[in-house]
Amino acid sequence: MNYPHPIIAREGWPFIAIAAVVALLIHAVGGFGLAWPFWLLLVFVVQFFRDPPRAVPTQANAVLCPADGRIVAVETAHDPYADREALKISVFMNVFNVHSQRSPVDGAVQKVEYFPGAFLNAALDKASAENERNAVVIQTGAGHTVTAVQIAGLVARRILCYVRAGEPLSRGQRYGFIRFGSRVDVYLPKGSRARVSIGEKVSASSTILAELPEQP
């Protein structure tokens, strides 16, 4: 299980440093009685930016979960990024989940599109169309198209994506991060079979979301 990233995500290092300095300064001036809420805040920030390695299933037609969280949608829907009817599976991340995003399949990035938008509660269905979001369209070696959409939430105001069109992605590979609560929508080819249900807790990479059909 090779995961070449720090167990505490780099995206969080500045926030952790600021929280630690503030806690230390207040502790030095007013003691633990005054500083304990800031130490608690530091613990929260550290846990928010944790980014542990995960086991990656090897099943050939498996679509892996791109994020930790809870399933809030499993439905047939239009994929506006690949202009097709698709199976849509949505994962909602609260502030206690790991917030890095990992590729659901092996493939090549066909396009990356960013859309500015609102910051509604990411658990709501309308967040898919109205919130700030970033779509990554991936084509597998077998010719299947898989779309993964990072969606900002009520608190999240910063979507980070580290891949560009033409670049390869491996299943389980870390490709993005959303700070402070968010959602990821995955659009799959018609004929894909969902392996999760609404309300189910899922883990990035190690949970199989769905199985792709044999033919594109």
UniProtKB/Swiss-Prot annotation:
GO terms for molecular function: phosphatidylserine decarboxylase activity. GO terms for cellular component: plasma membrane. Is synthesized initially as an inactive proenzyme. Formation of the active enzyme involves a self-maturation process in which the active site pyruvoyl group is generated from an internal serine residue via an autocatalytic post-translational modification. Two non-identical subunits are generated from the proenzyme in this reaction, and the pyruvate is formed at the N-terminus of the alpha chain, which is derived from the carboxyl end of the proenzyme. Its cofactor is pyruvate. The modification Pyruvic acid (Ser) is found at S182. It catalyses: a 1,2-diacyl-sn-glycero-3-phospho-L-serine + H(+) = a 1,2-diacyl-sn-glycero-3-phosphoethanolamine + CO2. The active site is at S182. It is found in: Cell membrane. Keywords: Cell membrane, Decarboxylase, Lipid biosynthesis, Lipid metabolism, Lyase, Membrane, Phospholipid biosynthesis, Phospholipid metabolism, Pyruvate, Zymogen. It comes from the Bacteria. The record marks G181, S182 as: Cleavage (non-hydrolytic). Pfam families: PS_Dcarbxylase (PF02666). Binds 1 pyruvoyl group covalently per subunit. Its main location: membrane. GO terms for biological process: phosphatidylethanolamine biosynthetic process. Catalyzes the formation of phosphatidylethanolamine (PtdEtn) from phosphatidylserine (PtdSer). NCBIfam families: AS_decarb, PRK05305.1-2, PRK05305.1-5, PRK05305.2-5. This is Phosphatidylserine decarboxylase proenzyme.
